[in-house]
Amino acid sequence: MKRRSVCVGDTVYVLAGNDKGKQGKVLSCLREKNKVVVEGINVRTKNIKRSQENPKGKRISIEAPIHVSNVRLSIEGAPAKISVKVTEKGRELWNKFPDGTSKLYRFVKERKG
C-alpha cells in the first residue's frame, strides 16, 4: 500500500464480497499484497490433519485477507470518504462530509525505508 489510510485497529466497512455491509476491526495489514485482515470478515474453515497432539484432527475458522480497495474507514458507523493532504508536517487524513465540509481524522507519519 503506497498510501495507506487503513491501519491496524481501525474499524472498517466492507464494500464488496460475501460480507458486504458488515463492519469489523483491522487485525493486520499486508502491505506488500495490499490486503488487510478484518475481525469476523471473510472467515474460512481450515482442516488440521491428525497428529500426535491432535489424534482426531480438527477444523478451525480463520479470517482470510481481503483487498484494501474493498474496505473503507468507518466513522460513526458509516463508511467515510477520506482525502489525503500533504503538508510540511507529513500526510493528513481528512474526513469529507456530504455537505462539502471536512474534518481532520488522523495524522500519518512518514515511514523511512
Curated annotation (Swiss-Prot):
Disulfide bonds: none annotated. GO terms for biological process: translation. NCBIfam families: rplX_bact. GO terms for molecular function: rRNA binding; structural constituent of ribosome. One of its GO terms (cellular component) is ribosome. One of two assembly initiator proteins, it binds directly to the 5'-end of the 23S rRNA, where it nucleates assembly of the 50S subunit. One of the proteins that surrounds the polypeptide exit tunnel on the outside of the subunit. It comes from Chlamydia felis (strain Fe/C-56) (Chlamydophila felis). InterPro entries: KOW, Rib_uL2_dom2, Ribosomal_uL24, Ribosomal_uL24_CS, Ribosomal_uL24_KOW, Translation_prot_SH3-like_sf. Belongs to the universal ribosomal protein uL24 family. Pfam families: KOW, ribosomal_L24. Keywords: Ribonucleoprotein, Ribosomal protein, RNA-binding, rRNA-binding. It comes from the Bacteria. Part of the 50S ribosomal subunit. This is Large ribosomal subunit protein uL24.
